[in-house]
A protein has these predicted regions:
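Acidic/polar, solvent-exposed loop/turn segments
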Residues: 1-174
């Protein structure tokens, strides 16, 4: 005979690397006149799964109120937006702010948009680069991105650069 075993992927993904869980079940065989019972035991081993990047989005607008659209996955402390899991939200603050991704197993691109509040152009300035998580700082046009050695990152807007934007104009550091 044969059998097929389909692991509960959610339970298997929750295992730490090197961890294990055992599942077993009984089966009965028969030759038409006699039967016997056997047990199949399956051990699922945890591995270090490759990270899956989830985009985090933070928007800082000058002269407004601090809000977060997806508060179920975020914690606000002062002028910081700490993200865990997949996030898409707005951080709107009247002073300098930072955005921290605390998931050390994932890496993703970071896009920050600065906006002045009223009237004017809606043009966007964008650039794109890739950076390693080695504890370095990268200075963009409108702020500084610091990538921690543990994979965390913080973006701090530069007030002088964002003050140069016209009212209603936005710019993106990517």
């Amino acid at each position: 005979g044969s059998y097929t075993y389909v692991a509960n992927q959610t339970a298997a993904d929750a295992l730490d690397a090197g961890g294990s869980v055992t599942d077993s079940f009984n089966y009965t065989i028969s030759d038409g006149s006699a039967t016997d019972i056997g047990t199949i035991t399956i051990t699922v081993l945890g591995i270090n799964d490759a990270p899956v990047a989830q985009d985090d989005v933070g928007v800082i607008a000058e002269g407004s109120t601090l809000t977060v659209a997806n508060s179920a996955n975020a914690t606000l402390t002062g002028d910081s937006y700490d993200a865990t899991g997949e996030n898409s939200g707005d951080v709107i603050d009247t002073s300098s702010s930072s955005h921290t991704d605390s998931d050390a197993d994932a890496s993703s691109s970071l896009s920050i948009t600065h906006v002045k509040l009223s009237g004017g152009s809606n043009s966007t300035v964008a650039s794109s680069s890739s950076y390693n998580s080695n504890g370095t700082s990268i200075t963009g046009t409108y702020g500084t991105l610091t990538i921690g050695a543990d994979g965390s990152y913080t973006y701090a807007a530069t007030t002088d650069a964002t003050d140069a934007l016209d009212a209603g104009e936005s710019a993106t550091d990517t």
